[in-house]
A protein has these predicted regions:
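Feature marking well-ordered beta-strand scaffolds used for ligand recognition
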Residues: 1-108
Length: 108
């Protein structure tokens, strides 16, 4: 096993307290969605070039109708009629957030 790349919290990525990850595909393109427990957020990462991951979108608790992401933890993805969704646990909100249209629904 070899590490081919890393992504770290900072200017481009919002990953402080990264704790959960799920992957999904749009066509042939792989993506990951990562929960950031300490930043009450989820980050979508474009993995088309595994040696150079690209931030593709973010959702933060309290912004743009995202109200259940405080202390975001677990995440899973699923597909209904070709639409991709993520369900994220918001530990401190005692709830879940269901996000659709990944990654285009999540912006900077």
């Amino acid at each position: 096993m070899n590490a081919v790349a890393t992504a770290q919290d900072g200017i481009v990525f919002t990953l402080d307290g990264a704790i959960g990850v799920a992957t999904f595909y749009i066509g042939d393109s792989p993506y990951a969605i990562v929960t950031a427990n300490d930043q009450d957020s989820v980050q979508v990462i474009d993995l088309r070039d595994p040696s150079s991951p690209v931030a593709a979108g973010i959702a933060v608790d309290g912004e743009r109708n995202f109200t259940m992401l405080e202390r975001a933890r677990g995440v899973a993805t699923f597909t209904i009629n070709a639409s991709i969704f993520a369900i994220v646990c918001g530990r401190s909100d005692d709830g879940v957030c269901i996000c659709e249209h990944l990654p285009t629904a999540l912006f900077y």
